């Protein structure tokens, strides 16, 4: 489906979100909740301090309730300076993150980014700006859970460098 044309998701009865795992210099994280931003009519209104509003895009009438699967490409990820690739911050995570709860998938994605950033610096290295959209999608927009302890994670494959 061509991104940006709001008539496209209107025609669909089901959507699959296929974002890549990456940090974003305007929203902290640029993975799940930015998937449908081009359909919002005003993408720039969701950047920086307004990034907490990204969840409202998932409640637009032509998107709400249609996403049946979120599949994050975490094969080769970006933990800073995104969305443009910067080789200093790319690494082969070699994973896929799948789920039906977009907030849970974004929470797991955020956990992986934060753990990689901590491993790179040897100390906590918070995303900047902070990814306000994750907790807001849970608390304000009721799209799922942002509490890691409530998320059931099933691992398949190797466990080395899992960061979870």
Show where each model-derived region lies.
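Extended, low-polarity segments enriched in aliphatic/aromatic residues
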Residues: 1-164
């Amino acid at each position: 489906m061509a991104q940006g044309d709001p008539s496209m998701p209107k025609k669909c009865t089901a959507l699959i979100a296929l974002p890549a795992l990456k940090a974003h210099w305007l929203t902290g994280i640029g993975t799940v909740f930015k998937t449908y931003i081009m359909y919002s009519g005003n993408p720039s209104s969701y950047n920086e301090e307004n990034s907490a509003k990204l969840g409202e895009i998932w409640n637009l009438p032509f998107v709400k309730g249609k996403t049946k699967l979120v599949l994050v490409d975490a094969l080769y990820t970006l933990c800073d300076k995104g969305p443009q690739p910067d080789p200093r911050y790319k690494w082969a995570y070699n994973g896929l993150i799948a789920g039906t709860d977009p907030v849970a998938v974004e929470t797991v994605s955020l956990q992986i980014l934060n753990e990689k950033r901590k491993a790179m610096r040897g100390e906590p290295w918070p995303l900047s700006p902070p990814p306000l959209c994750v907790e807001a999608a849970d608390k304000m927009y009721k799209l799922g859970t942002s509490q890691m302890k409530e998320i059931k994670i099933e691992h398949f494959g190797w466990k080395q460098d899992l960061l979870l």
